[in-house]
């Protein structure tokens, strides 16, 4: 009898598995494909504080994100590295004072941080072979953290295994029957697992698992957060983004 069966091998699933097994629980994780084969390998590949959330006054979220960024930097320096972002000032979008206050707040909310703080830059004089248009005269630099997202998933999974978790790949959950005090879960290879609890960490497939597999009725809907990432050739030799 397992204490916990986790459905989904993305960053949430393996992170929960690592945490739970570290607390002494008997854990099995089931993934229908490979680890990080879906959303967790399609991210922005950034661990960031969410600077844009300052405009909607979500200060607690930004503070928590910045603290977690420092945690990742300290425990996984081999797969993460600081990256500087250059934010050109466009006068008709935001005034200079607003950008500066926002970045000062971004630095302050992070508390004691090891990444370089934000600063003002002259875009025409501070960079060699500046590729930006001439009408961009000034801007600001700030720091965030880039990371290998898929590798972060694999490292969490490996640590969970080392602590005693069972991770089953290329094997989907086909049925889950609720008994009085446990779940009986059937996998696609006909294997049966009994578990005290199930965590549905299947990302955009959570409602499918809930309704079709666990037979749980719900009127809840799923709001997907989607974005587009554009990859372009590097235009100059600087390290900034």
What are these language model-derived features?
Residues 47, 218-240:
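Central beta-strand plus flanking loop segment that forms part of the substrate or channel wall
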Residues 1-12, 28:
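Beta1/beta-strand and adjacent pyrophosphate-binding region of the FAD-binding site
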Residues 7, 193-203:
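Short hydrophobic core segments
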Residues 200-215:
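Flavin (primarily FAD) binding-site architecture
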Residues 1-4, 19-23:
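Extreme N-terminal leader/targeting segments of oxidoreductases
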Residues 21-41:
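Glycine-rich FAD pyrophosphate-binding loop
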Residues 140-189, 193-196:
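Helical element adjacent to the flavin cofactor pocket in flavoenzyme catalytic cores
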Residues 45-129:
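Dinucleotide-binding Rossmann-like beta1-alpha1 core, especially the glycine-rich loop
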């Amino acid at each position: 009898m397992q204490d916990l069966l986790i459905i989904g091998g993305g960053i949430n699933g393996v992170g929960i598995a690592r945490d739970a097994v570290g607390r002494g629980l008997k854990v099995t994780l089931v993934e229908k494909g490979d680890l990080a084969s879906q959303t967790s390998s399609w991210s922005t590949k950034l661990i960031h504080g969410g600077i844009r959330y300052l405009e909607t006054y979500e200060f607690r979220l930004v503070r928590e994100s910045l603290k977690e960024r420092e945690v990742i930097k300290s425990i996984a320096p081999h797969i993460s590295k600081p990256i500087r972002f250059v934010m050109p000032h466009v006068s008709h979008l935001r005034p200079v004072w607003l950008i500066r206050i926002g970045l000062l707040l971004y630095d302050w909310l992070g508390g004691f941080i090891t990444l370089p703080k934000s600063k003002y830059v002259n875009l025409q004089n501070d960079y060699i072979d500046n590729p930006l248009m001439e009408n961009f005269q000034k801007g600001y630099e700030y720091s965030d953290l880039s990371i290998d997202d898929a590798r972060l998933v694999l490292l969490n999974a490996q640590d969970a295994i080392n602590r005693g978790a069972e991770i089953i790949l290329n094997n989907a959950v086909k049925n889950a029957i609720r008994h009085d005090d446990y779940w009986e879960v059937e996998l696609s290879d006909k294997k049966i697992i009994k578990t005290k609890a199930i965590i549905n960490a299947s990302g955009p497939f959570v409602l499918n698992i809930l309704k079709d597999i666990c037979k749980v009725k719900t009127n809840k809907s799923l709001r997907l957060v989607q974005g587009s990432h554009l990859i372009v050739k590097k235009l100059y030799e600087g390290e900034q983004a």
